[in-house]
Amino acid sequence: MSLLPVMVIFGLSFPPIFLELLISLALFFVVRRILQPTGIYEFVWHPALFNTALYCCLFYLTSRLFS
């Protein structure tokens, strides 16, 4: 359970996990931008599956930081 409060933006209520999702999405774009020039995607069998797993790992790390 997150200790962050519920965010209200322009009258819309967002759960505390929304901030964690946005942070992990930003980290995902940075890490993917770093990995693409290295050529690691040539060794990956399914790039979309790799990206999904990478995002899940980053989301897990982000949620562990906030809990």
Curated annotation (Swiss-Prot):
It is found in: Cell membrane. The keyword Thylakoid does not apply. Keywords: Cell membrane, Membrane, Transmembrane, Transmembrane helix. Its main location: membrane. It is a multi-pass membrane protein. The chain crosses the membrane at residues 3-23, 39-59. It holds the Pfam family DUF1656. One of its GO terms (cellular component) is plasma membrane. It comes from the Bacteria. Belongs to the AaeX family. HAMAP family: AaeX. This is Protein AaeX. It comes from Yersinia pestis.
